[in-house]
Amino acid sequence: MTKSELIERLAGQQSHIPAKAVEDAVKEMLEHMAATLAEGERIEIRGFGSFSLHYRAPRVGRNPKTGDKVELDGKYVPHFKPGKELRDRANIYG
């Protein structure tokens, strides 16, 4: 599901709320989540999961075109850990 599909679905379910207001709310929520992660803070949504940053250590990579070795710096990457409720709901398809 893309962001626009999410907005469309939410707007369809909440017909009393203008679609533009739903779009603004979704964009604002995602912006706040991104800003919170950028500050190094963890986000926890009970029953859904948690977002945090994980550190990736420096390593030697490889240029796929030339095959040359490339030094890659360490960096922080976003990480999502699903909550128990979400894992249980997803397992009905597994």
From Swiss-Prot:
Taxonomy, superkingdom: Bacteria
GO MF: DNA binding; structural constituent of chromatin
Keywords: DNA recombination, DNA-binding, Transcription, Transcription regulation, Translation regulation
InterPro entries the record matches: Hist_DNA-bd, Histone-like_DNA-bd_CS, IHF-like_DNA-bd_dom_sf, IHF_beta
GO cellular component annotations of the record: chromosome; cytosol
Pfam families xref list: Bac_DNA_binding
CDD domains named among the record's database cross-references: IHF_B (cd13836)
Gene Ontology BP term (one): regulation of DNA-templated transcription
Gene3D superfamilies xrefs: IHF-like DNA-binding proteins (4.10.520.10)
Family per record: Belongs to the bacterial histone-like protein family.
Subunit architecture: Heterodimer of an alpha and a beta chain.
Protein task: This protein is one of the two subunits of integration host factor, a specific DNA-binding protein that functions in genetic recombination as well as in transcriptional and translational control.
The name this protein goes by in its record: Integration host factor subunit beta
Organism this protein belongs to: Serratia marcescens
